[in-house]
Amino acid sequence: MAGINKVIIVGHLGNDPEIRTMPNGDAVANISVATSESWNDRNTGERREVTEWHRIVFYRRQAEICGEYLRKGSQVYVEGRLKTRKWQDQNGQDRYTTEIQGDVMQMLGGRNQNAGGYGNDMGGAPQSSYQARQTNNGNSYQSSRPAPQQAAPQAEPPMDGFDDDIPF
């Protein structure tokens, strides 16, 4: 049976994306996303919080989108998988790092927030949203920008014959 390697992160960028271009011309974006969890300490009753930083890498079109739209403080939803890379440092020592290879990225929050400002996010539907998906082979992309939807005003049906007496 095959294993599952899937990561889902929702957090805020700690810095602007770092964008590089590989020798073959493909873009690479590195982002650092913070997630936090908080709890009340049983012994002291104090509110405690710990922040975890996640290094996420995007390639090709997704990397370009990151560089164009994401800024420090932007809230983002990421799906991806853990990857471990090996390289040699200046002394010839083998070094390893584990990072998330992003497959799906969706910007959350309002337009001002994704531009680096502090938008007024009241917890409703995002004002600005962009989702990009990358297949496992990295060659096919599907991106969509949902159109804003507003409900058309509906006329209420007439209340003729409505009895407003409560039966109890």
Curated annotation (Swiss-Prot):
Residues 109-168 are annotated as: Disordered. Residues 146-158 have a biased composition (Low complexity). Residues 126-145 have a biased composition (Polar residues). Pfam families: SSB. InterPro entries: NA-bd_OB-fold (IPR012340), Primosome_PriB/ssb (IPR000424), ssDNA-bd (IPR011344). Residues 4-109 form the SSB domain. PROSITE patterns: SSB. A motif (Important for interaction with partner proteins) lies at residues 163-168. GO terms for biological process: DNA recombination; DNA repair; DNA replication. Homotetramer. Plays an important role in DNA replication, recombination and repair. Binds to ssDNA and to an array of partner proteins to recruit them to their sites of action during DNA metabolism. This is Single-stranded DNA-binding protein.
